[in-house]
Structure formats: C-alpha cells, structure tokens
Amino acid sequence: MTTPPPQLASAQNPSGDTPTWAMILGRLTTGQGLAPGQTAWAMDQIMTGTATPAQIAAFAVSMKMKRPTSAEVTELADIMLKHARRVPTDVIGTATVDIVGTGGDGANTVNLSTMAAIVVAAAGVPVVKHGNRAASSLSGGADTLEALGLRIDLGPDEVARCVAEVGIGFAFAPQFHPSYRHAGAVRREIGVPTVFNLLGPLTNPASPRAGLIGCAWADLAEVMAGVFATRGSSVLVVHGDDGLDELTTTTTSTIWRVQAGTVERLTFDPAAFGFARAHVSELTGGDAESNAASARAVLGGAKGPVRDAVVLNAAGALVAHAGLSSDAKWVPAWESGLARAKDAIDSGAAEQLLARWVRFTQQL
C-alpha cells in the first residue's frame, strides 16, 4: 500500500494542515482565533462558490462574535481583492481617497459619505468611492447616486476615466466583486451585521491610499485600522460616539488615525472647530429620491445640520489625504480641510462637479 504524500505548506496554509469547515467553525464558536492561512482558506471557499450557505452564515456570524483580529480581516480582504476586478491605476495613481462606512449603525441617516465625496473631489482631491445599494437602511450610496442621475454600472476602465476626467468615480461593488455574490446573498438573509460588514471599506478595487472610513462598532474600528496600517495607508477610521459610522456632529467621535504604519486613537470634538451640536433626528434620511433631494440642497448651498455633517466628513477625508505627506500637522490640516470643504460648496464647485459627473457617466 502506498503512503499518501505529506500535505505541503503554502502561503494560504503555512501550517501544512488541510483546513476544514469543522475545524474552523469549531475554533470560532469556542472563541479561539484562527491560525495563519485558515481565514484565507475559508474566504477562498466562499468566493469560489465551494462553501454552502450554512457554512458561510456560520462563519460570518461566529467570526464577528469571536471578534476578528486585524490579521484575520487582512486575510479576508486580501482574498476578496484577489478575486476582484480592479480599477486600472496607471493613469489615476493610488494617491486617491475613499469615503465609506461599514453601515449597520441603524440610524438611517442621509448619505453623508456620498455628499462628502463630491465635496472632496470639488476641492481638488481625486476620489474613488466604493459602495453598494442599501443593506439595512432605506437608501445606500448607490441608490442615491442613481437617483441623482448617475450611471452606477460602470466597469473598471470607465471608473478610471471618470476619475481622470471629472475627479471622482464610483465603483459599484457588485460590478467589481462578482465572486462575493455567494456571501452577499447569505448576508442579506441573515439581516444582522457580520464580519462581512468590515470588508467593503477594505476592498476598494482602486486601492486608494487615503480614506475616511466609518465603522459602526468601536471595538472593530481598531481592527480595521490595524489592516490599513499594514498597507501603509493614511486613513482616519472613525466612530461617532453616538453610534454613527461617520464623524458625527451630535457629540464627539473616536478617531483611529493611521499614518506611516502606526495607529493613534484620538477623541475628536467638532465643537472645537465651531460646529453646533445637532440631534441625530436632524440627520435622518429617507428613500433614494429623498436623499438625492437632500444632496442637491446641500451642494446647492443650503445651510443647516446636514451641511455641517457633510463639511465635517469631507474635511476628515482631506485631512486623511494630507496625511500621505509625512509633515502634515493635525490641527492645521483640519483648519485647511474645513476651509476647503466649505469653499467647494459655497463657490458652486461641488454642485457643478456633480452635474459634470452625471453627464460624463451618461455619455460613456
């Protein structure tokens, strides 16, 4: 009788032991972390359609309940990107910025990150926004952009052209992560946040090196920051202390500032920069048409709590982008970012950029 050859170690499975779902789920459901390569194996099974819906659901929920490590989430994101369609960066580069949140905060606010992205682009910083339709709220970023007249179904080359020509592009997640459809269907059926909520902000197909990344869970925001730190990104991972996955104007926010491979935790109070306290009800959104109307109003110069929150988040993204330069100072960067965000709206530049972006996508 011949002896089977020994299992060889690989980059995905450095221990050499063949992972199984029983092994992985057994560890997660007893609160144990996974060995290097095991998370990557599980995600590859999911992305290739090999995993069953029951296995996907059990993995997604138990990983979040266990609380994933940055190393585990890095493996999830890396495998997801391995299967993704990528936005070509030979022309637009990677000194771009994303403004996106995990969702799952249950607040159903207007699409602050979508409006802020337009303001940032109007301020002269190239934006590649990664987003999707609503999962738990009434309207996601994709829904609102579509209601504004944008074509959201663009492919990699077309998104790159938008960034090159207009200064902003939207990468609609299903177009770039077709292999994620297996997990996406299960995620919608489960209806509660899972570890997969963390992956959208970590898998932008244009690999922007800067970002304002909102996280609805304070304990997982630090995990996300750790992933960005391994990439050498300049990112502000933010969690409103009212629970929002944005920089909030209702109270303070906690910021994990990622720069040059390090993570620094800070408390940020918008009142220090002259912002009035808002009530979360003043930031509440509606369906896509309602949120599109709010966006048109803010970009058209309407004052009030929604504008304040948009300016604050746009400034945060500009601060993150400034952090790509090692000599960026915190307070001066905020002062500059706030001034640029306000001017982008008040000068009409943001409103004009949206109109130009819509026209450009319709002509592609």
Swiss-Prot record:
Class of the enzyme per the UniProt entry, highest EC level: transferase
UniProt subunit comment: Homodimer.
Stated name of the protein: Anthranilate phosphoribosyltransferase
Keywords of the record: Amino-acid biosynthesis, Aromatic amino acid biosynthesis, Glycosyltransferase, Magnesium, Metal-binding, Transferase, Tryptophan biosynthesis
UniProt: anthranilate 1 binding residues: 101, 132
Residues annotated to bind Mg(2+) 2: 245-246
E.C. designation(s): 2.4.2.18
Family of the protein in this entry: Belongs to the anthranilate phosphoribosyltransferase family.
Catalytic activity: N-(5-phospho-beta-D-ribosyl)anthranilate + diphosphate = 5-phospho-alpha-D-ribose 1-diphosphate + anthranilate
InterPro entries xrefs: Anthranilate_Pribosyl_Tfrase, Glycosyl_Trfase_fam3, Glycosyl_Trfase_fam3_N_dom, Glycosyl_Trfase_fam3_N_dom_sf, Nuc_phospho_transferase
GO MF annotation, one: anthranilate phosphoribosyltransferase activity
Natural source organism: Mycolicibacterium vanbaalenii (strain DSM 7251 / JCM 13017 / BCRC 16820 / KCTC 9966 / NRRL B-24157 / PYR-1) (Mycobacterium vanbaalenii)
Pathway linked to the protein: Amino-acid biosynthesis; L-tryptophan biosynthesis; L-tryptophan from chorismate: step 2/5
Residues at which anthranilate 2 binds: 187
GO CC entries: cytosol
GO biological process: L-tryptophan biosynthetic process
Biological role: Catalyzes the transfer of the phosphoribosyl group of 5-phosphorylribose-1-pyrophosphate (PRPP) to anthranilate to yield N-(5'-phosphoribosyl)-anthranilate (PRA).
HAMAP family cross-referenced by the UniProt entry: TrpD
Cofactors named for this entry: Mg(2+)
Pfam families in the record: Glycos_trans_3N, Glycos_transf_3
Binding-site residues, 5-phospho-alpha-D-ribose 1-diphosphate: 101, 104-105, 109, 111-114, 129-137, 141
Cofactor stoichiometry and binding remark: Binds 2 magnesium ions per monomer.
Superkingdom of source: Bacteria
Binding annotation for Mg(2+) 1: 113, 246
